[in-house]
Curated annotation (Swiss-Prot):
Stated family: Belongs to the universal ribosomal protein uS17 family.
Pfam families xref list: Ribosomal_S17
Keywords on record: Ribonucleoprotein, Ribosomal protein, RNA-binding, rRNA-binding
GO biological process, one term: translation
Name of the protein in its database record: Small ribosomal subunit protein uS17
Originating organism: Azotobacter vinelandii (strain DJ / ATCC BAA-1303)
Amino acid sequence: MAEAQKTVRTLTGRVVSDKMDKTITVLIERRVKHPIYGKYVKRSTKLHAHDETNQCRIGDTVTIRETRPLAKTKSWMLVEVVERAVEV
């Protein structure tokens, strides 16, 4: 039997915390149309992602993908750093 290929979910967001060891917090923002008023509203989600080499810093734009649960709240893994944050 041929098993169905499961597509891997990937998201792009901004790193808002890198204080944990090998873990980053990524803020995912999306725009949703209000069902009654029709205005587009920003909605956001914070996800914990696994960063094996601790390469991400606050403000970086990253791509993450879904993976097996690695901890109680961590089920995402870092794929790549899309854009580095500007150092001040």
